[in-house]
A protein has these predicted regions:
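Glycine-rich, flexible N-terminal cofactor/catalytic loop recognition
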Residues: 1-59
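Class I SAM-dependent methyltransferase SAM-binding "motif I" and its flanking Rossmann-like core
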Residues: 95-153
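Generic beta-sheet signal
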Residues: 4-8, 74-82, 130, 155-159, ...
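Conserved helicase motor
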Residues: 55-63, 136-139
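Glycine-centered tight-turn and secondary-structure capping sites
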Residues: 92-94, 252
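Short active-site oxyanion
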Residues: 25-32, 104-108, 156-157
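General beta-strand structural signal in soluble alpha/beta enzymes
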Residues: 34, 109-112, 159, 184
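A contiguous loop/helix-start segment that scaffolds small-molecule binding in enzyme catalytic cores
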Residues: 2, 77, 156, 163-282
């Protein structure tokens, strides 16, 4: 009988952030396929787990998957882990999972830590729906396409960025979509955890960029393409400004400017809507 491929989420920083079930699976499987066996060794040692490991990263996944599938076909259970968080989310593992599915092997998720959801939950920005965009490309042509895609999004987006590119990326985001509300997380769950909230311009002033991968949550405005957009009512504008001032901590003036840009209105038009709502008692 074939074994099972377990997709195991591991801590994104604090080694205590791992489920009892994940620890049991890591102890019981025959082999752990790890993005970096050295980093995984620290986690296993912390929890006294002696299961053998093998490397599975972006440079060897295509060639290594076949041998792992053979072990699974032979009845071995295998756990897939990344350096941090949930495998395949901007991490290796997708090829192995697809190969296992094609081979009729059971793939079972073991949920747990996620930098995406951790940053989103603590951001104070709307979370009912969001778009995850991974890492912005590094090549100029690809970055241009990536930012053009972001500009067409209306709502909350989450993406990762490296420390040596975070300021460049946030400045480019500001030029593309305006000074939108953001929450920028660094070293989440670690000793030097930092989560900076506010408009991009203010967040950049307080941002430390010395180390640690960044997780960015941003509330992007309406699409600026030629599609028809229904103008929001005065009540909707007032409610939107209220959410920004209450949850993100923006001043009323900044919230008005952001809402105006988002909906293609003048700040005076939005201000008048707020004043009209006050007078009518809405």
């Amino acid at each position: 009988m074939p074994g099972t491929l377990f997709v195991v989420a591991t801590p994104i920083g604090n080694l205590e952030d791992i489920t009892v079930r994940a620890l049991r699976i890591l102890r019981e499987v025959s082999l752990i396929a790890a993005e970096d066996t050295r980093r995984t060794a620290h986690l296993l040692a912390r929890h006294a787990i002696a299961t053998p490991t093998t490397s599975l990263h972006e440079h060897n996944e295509a060639g290594k998957s076949a041998s792992l599938i053979e072990r699974l076909r032979g009845g071995d259970h295998v756990a897939l882990v990344s350096d941090a968080g949930t495998p395949t989310v901007s991490d290796p593992g997708g090829q192995l999972i697809r190969a296992a599915i094609d081979a009729g092997i059971r793939v079972e998720p073991i949920p747990g830590p996620s930098a995406v959801l951790a940053a989103l939950a603590a951001s104070g920005l709307p979370t009912d729906s969001f778009s995850f965009l991974g890492f912005p490309p590094t090549r100029a042509k690809d970055r241009k396409s990536w930012f053009a895609r972001v500009k067409r999004i209306a709502g909350t987006v989450v993406f990762f960025e490296a420390p040596h590119r975070i300021r460049e990326t946030m400045s480019e985001l500001q030029r593309t979509v305006g000074d939108c509300p953001v929450a920028i997380g660094r070293e989440l769950t670690k000793v030097h955890e930092e989560l900076v909230r506010g408009p991009i311009s203010e967040a950049l002033v307080h941002l430390s960029d010395d180390r640690g991968e960044f997780t960015v949550v941003a509330m992007i405005g309406q699409s600026t393409d030629n599609t028809a957009v229904v103008a929001p009512s005065e009540t909707e504008l007032v409610l939107e400004i209220g959410r920004m001032t209450a949850s993100v901590g923006l001043t009323k003036r900044k919230a008005i400017n952001i809402v105006a840009r988002k909906h293609g209105l003048t700040p005076n038009r939005v201000y008048d809507a707020v004043e009209a709502a006050k007078k009518s008692g809405k």
